[in-house]
Each structure stands twice: as structure tokens, then as C-alpha cells.
């Protein structure tokens, strides 16, 4: 790697000179590529931990991603719930790998490091592809949450991940003249260009979705913050990393701030999704109380209802729907039907003396 290398498409010379990327130790000559300034190391026993501040940030990202994942899973009827859950699972997977690779818990000289770095690169590609497809869920080209939607997302992400895994392996091993540690165009496209394209398409698709279908324009702010954090993370990583590292005396570098910016971008993705999805309370199993508003005037405040009003029609206090009499008025407040029904109404004038013989007949 030449000193003060200029940026060139397809080349990692400039980028690896400024930032400690996972793939840089496998590129270039026999010694790999290393940044001109990187954060201090910490020794824990016999283990040297590289990028300690960044590792702590990765752990914090795992905690935050878990919290967001649990919140997403609690919205049982939200649109695109299962699809965005897969995105957060993949983000957690990527962060787990980043802890072991950024910290050099898996040493760069170890024979398995190229394979883990390739798995990490493939997982990153699959993660951004999953984000891109989540951007089209809101357009309802096919129903979300169905086996077709989920399996298409899973299989396509697996295919993209396999491609983004195979290209680094071929590059690290130098399987051909077009893919070698010194010819990195394919890796440059899959590892750096492809994620940026996915974020751009996601941003444009969501802006169209908000403008065309939603009344709430406040969610545009979430998208703008997401894009801003992502762009800031890229710039901090590939442009200002050395400047930051020198300014803070090697305590942190651009990798730390770019990881933080990417975490904020993921949090904005969650915030945006949470803002545009509404839960159907009829099928919600949440623990919130008094979520229903009483609209029926019969149940409104001021209308008293007593359990005693539900008595039998023969002894109750309420009026009958027939003739305007209640049970006590109609049956003379007597305990039985046979004893009072004919004695209180028209038949009583004939039956009081014991039979029909004393009547008008």
C-alpha cells in the first residue's frame, strides 16, 4: 500500500489507510493493509483486545437491538412485523461477528480469520438486502407475513449473502487474476457499494410511500435522520478516521464513531417503522388498561344500572313493554298467577261467587 494513496474505485488502498476494516488484513501484500492511525489496545490477561471502545459499543448495540426486537415482536398485528424482525435478527448476528473480528479475539494471523471475515462480509450484504426488501413491504405487492413473503425474503437474503461471502473468499485466496488480494473490484462492489445502493433505494422507496399513501409527514424526519446518520457513519469511517484518531491521542478512531452512527441509523429505521404501523387493538394482547373508548350512549356516564333491575317480570320494578303495566300492577302484587290473574281483571266479576251461574249468562 502506497503512502497517502488517493481514492480509486475498486481499490481498498485509500480506505484501509484511513480505517481498520475487517477485510483489510487480508488484502494487499503479505502483511495486509493497516491504517496509519488506530485506537489503543487493551490487554486482558494473555489476550490483547483491539478497538476496546468499539467492542463496548458493539455490546451496547446488541442490547439496543434486543430491546427494539422485543418491541417489534409485541406489535402482533402490525404490517411487516415478521419481515422487520428478520432484519433485527440479522443485525444482531452481524454485531456478534463484529465483536470477535474488530477486537481481534480471532487473530488476523489465524487460519480461520479469512473465513470469519468472509462470513461477516456475506452477512453484511444479506443485512442490507433484507433492509431493501423491507422497504417494499409497505407497497403490499404481496401480503406481508405470509409464507410467500417470508420465504422470499429469507431465500433471497441467503442467496445475496452467499454471493457476498463467495467473492471475499475468492479475493482472499486469489483464485483468479480478476479476484486476488491486489485486485479487489468485486469485493469493493459487494462490501462497500452494494450496501450504499440498498440504503439509497430504501430511502427513496419510503419517501414515495410516505408522500403517496400517508397523511402523517412527521415520519419524513425519521427517514432524514436515518440517512444523515448513515452518511455521517460512512464519512467518519473513510474520511475523518485518521483526523479523529490523532486528535484524541489514539483512544478511539473513526471505527468507533461510524459504529455509533450506524447504530443510530438502525434505531431510526425502527422509529420510522414504529411510527407508520398501527396495531389493531381488537387482536392486541397488550397489558394496557382502558384502551377502549365507550361510544354507546346507553353506557355513558350518568346512566345508572343496578343488578336488582334484572328481576323476574312478575316481581320486578320495571315496566312491561306490553300495556304499560309492570308485573306487580298486572297481577295485583300477588305471589301466584293462578290466585290473582282472574281476580284482578275482567273475569273476576263472574268468578267471585264461585262460577258462571251468577254472571250475566
From Swiss-Prot:
<dbReference type="GO" id="GO:0051082">
    <property type="term" value="F:unfolded protein binding"/>
</dbReference>
<dbReference type="GO" id="GO:0071555">
    <property type="term" value="P:cell wall organization"/>
</dbReference>
<comment type="function">
    <text>Chaperone required for the export of the chitin synthase CHS3 from the endoplasmic reticulum.</text>
</comment>
<feature type="transmembrane region" description="Helical">
    <location>
        <begin position="48"/>
        <end position="68"/>
    </location>
</feature>
<keyword id="KW-1133">Transmembrane helix</keyword>
<dbReference type="Pfam" id="PF12271">
    <property type="entry name" value="Chs7"/>
</dbReference>
<feature type="transmembrane region" description="Helical">
    <location>
        <begin position="150"/>
        <end position="170"/>
    </location>
</feature>
<keyword id="KW-0812">Transmembrane</keyword>
<dbReference type="GO" id="GO:0005789">
    <property type="term" value="C:endoplasmic reticulum membrane"/>
</dbReference>
<feature type="transmembrane region" description="Helical">
    <location>
        <begin position="86"/>
        <end position="106"/>
    </location>
</feature>
<feature type="transmembrane region" description="Helical">
    <location>
        <begin position="218"/>
        <end position="238"/>
    </location>
</feature>
<keyword id="KW-0256">Endoplasmic reticulum</keyword>
<keyword id="KW-0472">Membrane</keyword>
<comment type="subunit">
    <text>Interacts with CHS3.</text>
</comment>
<keyword id="KW-0813">Transport</keyword>
<dbReference type="GO" id="GO:0006457">
    <property type="term" value="P:protein folding"/>
</dbReference>
<keyword id="KW-0961">Cell wall biogenesis/degradation</keyword>
<keyword id="KW-0653">Protein transport</keyword>
<dbReference type="GO" id="GO:0006031">
    <property type="term" value="P:chitin biosynthetic process"/>
</dbReference>
<dbReference type="InterPro" id="IPR022057">
    <property type="entry name" value="Chs7"/>
</dbReference>
<feature type="transmembrane region" description="Helical">
    <location>
        <begin position="184"/>
        <end position="204"/>
    </location>
</feature>
<dbReference type="GO" id="GO:0015031">
    <property type="term" value="P:protein transport"/>
</dbReference>
<feature type="transmembrane region" description="Helical">
    <location>
        <begin position="250"/>
        <end position="270"/>
    </location>
</feature>
<comment type="similarity">
    <text>Belongs to the CHS7 family.</text>
</comment>
<protein>
    <recommendedName>
        <fullName>Chitin synthase export chaperone</fullName>
    </recommendedName>
</protein>
<feature type="transmembrane region" description="Helical">
    <location>
        <begin position="119"/>
        <end position="139"/>
    </location>
</feature>
